[in-house]
Every structure is written in structure tokens, then in C-alpha cells.
């Protein structure tokens, strides 16, 4: 599996809404339709990992997305490490073991997160991994 990380700087804006709003399509309309067909919006949140902290390795049956609002970190998905920074959108496939840590003990990483649940999956306890 190749880690899917997209940066806002690599996306050209398209003017939408009758020429009034520039839109940066990080994931184009219907691009992930087949992959997420029958899914549902599982969650939307914002989180911050303090310098020196980390998100424990864990997995769940969702397509999860982290959008980095500020800071820098090391994202690990299925054993692959990759640096991420402000403007990056990371796709974490269902059941992929993943974790995140800031690059520094002195600076945090702050992310917006949302997940698409997989059809037929049961409830997930996000507080216990």
C-alpha cells in the first residue's frame, strides 16, 4: 500500500459557485465513490498532539482522513513513515494500523479529522485502543 498524502500547495484552485469562490479540491467529487460506497460519515473532529506526545498505533474499520492545520509530524501507516505538515491531507484506509507523533518534543501538531464508516461495521470505541 502506498501512503496517500496530498498537499494543498499541489492543488490549483477552481472557481466555483457562479465565479465567486475558489475551491481547492483535495479529493475530487466522486473520486472515492467506489471505495466508500455504502459508507457513512462516522465522525468529524479536531485534535492536537502535544510535543513529545503521540497517538498510539491502532486501527479501525473506517476510511479516516487527517488534514494538518498547523505543525509537523511523522505519520505511520502500515509500517510506512512519512513526514506531514500544514496543508497535508492523509488518507488512512480501513483496518490500517496507524499512529502520529510531532517531529519535536517542543511543538505540537494540530489536525482536523473525519472518517467514513464501512458498510456493515459495528460501533467503534475511539477512546480505547
Segments (PLM) and residue ranges:
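Conserved short histidine dyad/triad with adjacent acidic residue
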Residues: 27-33, 44-60, 94
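A short, N-terminal "cap"/entry segment at the start of jelly-roll beta-barrel domains
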Residues: 1-41, 125-129
Amino acid at each position: 500500500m502506498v501512503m496517500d498524502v496530498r498537499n494543498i500547495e499541489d492543488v490549483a484552485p477552481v472557481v466555483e459557485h457562479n465565479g465567486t469562490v475558489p475551491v481547492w479540491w483535495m479529493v475530487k467529487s466522486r473520486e472515492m465513490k467506489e471505495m466508500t460506497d455504502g459508507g457513512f460519515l462516522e465522525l468529524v473532529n479536531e485534535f492536537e498532539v502535544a510535543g513529545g506526545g503521540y497517538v498510539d498505533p491502532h486501527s479501525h474499520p473506517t476510511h479516516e482522513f487527517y488534514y494538518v492545520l498547523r505543525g509537523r509530524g511523522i505519520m505511520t501507516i502500515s509500517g510506512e513513515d512519512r513526514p506531514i505538515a500544514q496543508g497535508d491531507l492523509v488518507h488512512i484506509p480501513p483496518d490500517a494500523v496507524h499512529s502520529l507523533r510531532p517531529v519535536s518534543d517542543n511543538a505540537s501538531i494540530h489536525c482536523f479529522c473525519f472518517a467514513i464508516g464501512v458498510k456493515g461495521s459495528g460501533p467503534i470505541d475511539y477512546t480505547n485502543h
